[in-house]
Amino acid sequence: MSMPATSTKTTKLATSLIDEYALLGWRAMLTEVNLSPKPGLVDRINCGAHKDMALEDFHRSALAIQGWLPRFIEFGACSAEMAPEAVLHGLRPIGMACEGDMFRATAGVNTHKGSIFSLGLLCAAIGRLLQLNQSLTPTTVCSTAASFCRGLTDRELRTNNSQLTAGQRLYQQLGLTGARGEAEAGYPLVINHALPHYLTLLDQGLDPELALLDTLLLLMAINGDTNVASRGGEGGLRWLQREAQTLLQKGGIRTPADLDYLRQFDRECIERNLSPGGSADLLILTWFLAQI
């Protein structure tokens, strides 16, 4: 594959360490897509509210992206002496090249564009922290990623142009900042909510898949998911959040019998053409950070 230039500065990171984190990123993507049943999302049971993609597309996509994750880590290390605000500019060509390989692997289907952005940021943050011999925890990784994105929401969402992107339109209409806002804030939905929730359930001995499904419900209940809003408007988003919150209040996903509630939720999401892809991306980050 064609590799964009990154930096002339050398790193002291061992290839084995870089590959270890890249492998975790790949495993995170596979863990999320194979998790079943997920309301409105592609999984092992069905294609959710998507008519243009299947489980195999996500498997091919994750493999293509895995080859680029070491480059994000390496650039994070190579740019460790740069001002954090300057790092994002250098990450963009790597992200675009990674995105190109994703589209080639899926014959043009957008399976993991959001994950390229978020995992790319976290991998670059990991590279920077390792290079600087700084503490590497979920919190420091996310705060470092946030420092790369300082001012991103203002630059890319607040505009008076007549030709608005989907993200700009949702920001102006509903105040949703999407993946950019979550990254710039240091992934608070993950750090303050999803990750501690998931780890607590694991500590209680809950089956890991059930724990992840319950954590997905939590994210769906609290995330202003632009994927949902772009398909169903504010009404669709509020409905999905309310349904997820109701399931959590009833006890969430604690036993295999509770999966029937998710299957019904899935059918309703498909009928409404709603897919919480933004929450799925955050679930990928949750699992990834739980391994650090």
From Swiss-Prot:
Catalytic activity reported: 3'-dephospho-CoA + ATP = 2'-(5''-triphospho-alpha-D-ribosyl)-3'-dephospho-CoA + adenine
MF terms in GO: ATP binding; triphosphoribosyl-dephospho-CoA synthase activity
Calcium listed as a keyword: no
Domain of life where this protein originates: Bacteria
Keywords: ATP-binding, Nucleotide-binding, Transferase
EC number: 2.4.2.52
Similarity comment: Belongs to the CitG/MdcB family.
PANTHER family per the UniProt record, alphabetical: 2-(5''-TRIPHOSPHORIBOSYL)-3'-DEPHOSPHOCOENZYME-A SYNTHASE, TRIPHOSPHORIBOSYL-DEPHOSPHO-COA SYNTHASE
Protein name according to UniProt: 2-(5''-triphosphoribosyl)-3'-dephosphocoenzyme-A synthase
Species in which this protein is naturally found: Escherichia coli O17:K52:H18 (strain UMN026 / ExPEC)
